[in-house]
A protein has these predicted regions:
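Secondary-structure end/capping motifs
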Residues: 241-323
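Cleavable N-terminal signal peptides
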Residues: 33-34, 44
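Short, glycine-/small- and polar/acidic-enriched structural segments
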Residues: 47-194, 198-204, 217-221, 226-227
């Protein structure tokens, strides 16, 4: 008896129902497989994640371009990109409110030393970058005695950078110069403009904004050439273990976003304009020029730069004294991607 024959007896009816049931099951299984494949390939059932970035500067651009270019969708990821200032982004990652974060090595190292289950898995900035700007009446670092110097938040990169600056000029933090939190990098320049502080840390595009406001460049930290883990991607080891394919896809999309940033100026400036909410073309041009020359092409973190952070922290944190830089990173995803020839192919042309 064939499935499409009309059953004549009770036995044939039972056989017909059984075969029909198996046919329905086969159809449902095929549909489920199709849905799964759609999700994996970036269709309507793509894996949703929340990604936090910790600063409003052009050094954060790789995930923005990865999203705007469709690279994240290409790897089956639907990402909600959220600005969470400074160390708050690391706190959100630890709490499980976001799945990945782009933060600084400073906030990450502090969290790991405090026992957080977090690792650095990629990086775009491995050198200390930044500038100290002051109000026009301040002509030398020594004139900051008795004044206030703004950072984003304690434990952030700007905090470490300011400490390096003060040490260089023999100024004692909170004795000679009061270091105050402003919340974020744009807020530092706003406070500087209003005279609420006399100096502050800045990175592009805020450096251009400070110049246009007539502020004085007091010290260029970029000239020091310090190896320091700056902008990096972090994840909890739990999420990496449970969602490794998602993390791998994200890093591939991230690397493609980085590639497009370095090779496509016009598109990159459009994306920066959207995320930074800045219309001034000169400011955007300056930011692009600065970061396109500073960001790493292949996003490996710097163990030397992590060691620098650990050594700085060891003065106040005993747990940092015997810490190994290797324990702060998980390079397995990057190594897997590199072994496949992905980076070679990406930068081939």
């Amino acid at each position: 008896m064939k499935l499409y024959d009309r059953p004549q007896t009770l036995l044939e009816c039972r056989i017909f129902v059984r075969r029909l049931s198996w046919l329905v099951i086969d159809i449902l299984l095929a549909a489920a497989l199709t849905i799964a494949l759609l999700g994996f390939s970036g269709g309507v059932f793509a894996q949703s994640i929340k990604f936090g970035y910790a600063a409003l500067n052009a050094g954060q651009v790789a995930p923005w371009i990865a999203k705007e270019s469709g690279y994240l969708s290409k790897y089956g990821i639907e990402a909600d990109l959220i600005y969470i200032p400074a160390v708050a982004a690391t706190q959100a990652l630890i709490a499980g409110e976001i799945q990945l974060a782009q933060v600084t090595g400073v906030s990450t190292a502090g969290a790991i030393l405090a026992g957080a289950d977090v690792r650095i898995i990629a990086s775009v900035q491995n050198k200390l970058a930044g500038t100290i700007y002051a109000r026009p009446e301040i002509t030398s670092p020594e004139q900051l005695k008795g004044k206030m110097l703004g950072i984003s938040r304690f434990g952030a990169l700007s905090d470490t950078a300011v400490s390096i600056f003060l040490q260089r000029y023999g100024l004692k933090r909170n004795t000679d110069v009061a270091v105050v939190q402003m919340g974020g990098l744009p807020e530092i320049i706003t406070a500087l403009e209003r005279g609420a502080i006399q100096a502050g840390f800045a990175n592009p595009p805020q450096t251009s904004r400070a110049k246009k406001l007539g502020m004085r460049q007091l010290f260029d930290l970029n000239t020091l050439g310090v190896d320091l883990q700056q902008t990096c991607v972090t994840v909890t080891t739990k999420y990496l273990r449970e969602r490794r394919p998602v993390v791998k896809g994200f890093i591939q999309a991230y690397a493609e976003g980085l590639h497009r940033f370095i090779t496509d100026r016009d598109f990159s400036i459009k994306v920066m304009k959207k995320y930074l909410r800045i219309d001034d073309k000169d400011i955007l041009d300056d930011a692009y020029t600065f970061y396109s020359e500073k960001l790493e092409k292949i996003p490996y973190p710097t163990l030397k730069g992590i060691k620098f952070i650990i050594d700085e922290m060891a003065e106040k944190n005993p747990q940092a004294k015997n810490a190994s830089p290797e324990s702060f990173v998980d390079l397995s995803v990057l190594q897997e991607i590199e072994k496949s020839g992905f980076f070679t192919q990406l930068w081939k042309n």
